[in-house]
Amino acid sequence: MVVGSIQIGISIPSTLKSHYWAAVFCTAAVALTSAAFADDAFGPMAVTAAAQPFKLGPLQLIALRDAQFVMHNDGKTFGSAADVATVGNLLKASNLPDDRLTLSVNALLVRAGKRVILIDSGLGPAVHGALMASLGEAGVAPDEVTDVLITHSHFDHVGGLAGADGKLAFPKAVIRMSTAEWAWMKSQPNAAALVKVIDGHVQTFTPGAPIAPGVTSVALNGHTPGHVGYEITSGKQSLLDIGDMAHSWVISLKKPEWTMQFDNDKATAMATRKATFARLAKSHELVFAPHFPYPGVGRVVADGDAYTWVPEVP
């Protein structure tokens, strides 16, 4: 998912590509955005709001459902070193349709003492985002959120930072992202509307820095210039929110060496994916994957030269 040119691997009208951010923050354009996707079976799709609580040691976490992407299998979105048939066969081997790829859009809420921390903000109201409704299911009001941690600035992770009225969606929250990511986001012309809304509310950090008690940023390089994950530690347990280090619970794990259309630096992203999966398989650390099937919580298990995703329903 690419904030600048809005490359999400599906068919989007050219006018929407040029004016996506304006559409997100203009009430009149919200209707245009919805209409643009209405006749396309592939695209961001609405989902039922959901909030799945689970424990990490004594810490309370909640997986929040936001939306779903359905994309054509074009043989290059997730397998630019492959072809349509090769990608399709990999999907069929996991009992999935071979003509499409389905990705969830999930966010993670962490209650840490008096802090209510949201990791990523989803698509936003213009493109079927259900995050606010899912927060409601969790019993959390937008003005209770104290921190919004951003893995990276692609629109399916930052679009929900502003509401349909163009104002801050989380008015009392500090928005935190890496210094490199904020600089890159500000350089993207199509992100200008959102940058204007959140500027003055953003605090940056260097990856590796502690963000909150028990929450540390982790460099997961390659997807965007400042992409990070967040490691949450509670007692003897830990969880890594991987952001967009991986997108498909099948392809990303079975073929971590395949380059991805969405990665800014494909070679670095591939190396990060391979190294991180190897570490996670060895440590058995819990993982939150925003684009894996909701609730996106599970573990990475070694499977020969590849890996398997094992959901761990809280």
Question: Each PLM stretch: what is its role?
Answer:
Residues 4-23:
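Bacterial N-terminal signal peptides that target proteins for export
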Residues 22-31:
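Bacterial N-terminal signal peptides
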Residues 34-38:
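Sec/Tat signal peptide C-region and signal peptidase I cleavage site
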Residues 39-41, 53, 136, 140, 144, 184, 201, 208-210, ...:
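Metallo-beta-lactamase
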Residues 50-138, 229-246:
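Conserved beta-strand hairpin/beta-sheet module of binuclear metal-dependent hydrolase folds
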Residues 66-67, 121-123, 153, 180-181, ...:
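Active-site metal-binding loops of divalent metal-dependent hydrolases
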Residues 100, 104-107, 127-174:
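Active-site metal-binding motif and surrounding structural segment of the metallo-beta-lactamase
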